[in-house]
């Protein structure tokens, strides 16, 4: 389980990215790099990091399910992810 503070910080970053998305797009189109650099650092989408919705783990993230590999495995074995079953051939 990730620290709550890290998960909250990531949510704060997501809100900032959404808030400044239009402004950033306009400034990039104009080529106004000075104004762009004066925006908050956390408003840049490059600073976002995907986190597992269950555990908050930042590594081993599966985009399609929004889960880390560990949480995915546990939930898949329990049959809680629709359409996912263990492979056998």
Swiss-Prot record:
Gene3D superfamilies: 30s Ribosomal Protein S14, Chain N. Keywords: Ribonucleoprotein, Ribosomal protein, RNA-binding, rRNA-binding. One of its GO terms (cellular component) is small ribosomal subunit. One of its GO terms (biological process) is translation. It comes from the Bacteria. Part of the 30S ribosomal subunit. Contacts proteins S3 and S10. This is Small ribosomal subunit protein uS14A. The lineage of its organism: Bacteria, Bacillati, Bacillota, Bacilli, Bacillales. The gene is rpsN.
């Amino acid at each position: 389980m990730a620290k709550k503070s890290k998960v909250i910080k990531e949510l704060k970053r997501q809100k900032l990215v959404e808030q400044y998305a239009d402004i950033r797009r306009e400034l990039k189109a104009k080529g106004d790099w000075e104004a762009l650099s004066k925006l908050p650092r956390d408003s840049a989408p490059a600073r976002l990091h995907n986190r597992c919705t269950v555990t908050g783990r930042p590594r081993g993230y599966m985009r399609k399910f929004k889960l880390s590999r560990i949480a995915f495995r546990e939930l898949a074995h329990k049959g809680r992810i629709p359409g996912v079953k263990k492979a056998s051939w």
